Swiss-Prot record:
Keyword Ribosomal protein: yes
Ribonucleoprotein found in the keyword field: yes
Gene Ontology molecular function, alphabetical: structural constituent of ribosome
Composition skew (Basic residues), residue ranges: 1-19
Pfam family name, one: Ribosomal_L34
Region listing for Disordered, in residue ranges: 1-20
Family under the similarity heading: Belongs to the bacterial ribosomal protein bL34 family.
Keywords noted in UniProt: Ribonucleoprotein, Ribosomal protein
Protein known as: Large ribosomal subunit protein bL34
InterPro entries listed in its UniProt record: Ribosomal_bL34, Ribosomal_bL34_CS
GO cellular component: ribonucleoprotein complex; ribosome
HAMAP family linked to this entry: Ribosomal_bL34
Domain of life of the source: Bacteria
């Protein structure tokens, strides 16, 4: 039987990436909350660099 989690960096970036977060009001709230908390990475795509493209 095939497992449910089939990892893909493209899907990961498109669903939880910085651009998607910034596109909605609640997404911006998440980014701001993570900034305030002092998170090392704000979103999935921010710590990927250009290697994931």
């Amino acid at each position: 039987m095939k497992r449910t989690f089939q990892p893909s960096n493209r899907k990961r970036r498109n669903k939880h990436g910085f651009r998607l977060r910034m596109s909605t009001k609640n997404g911006r709230r998440i980014i701001n909350a993570r900034r305030a908390k002092g998170r090392h990475s704000l979103s999935v795509s921010s710590d990927m660099g250009t290697a994931g493209r």
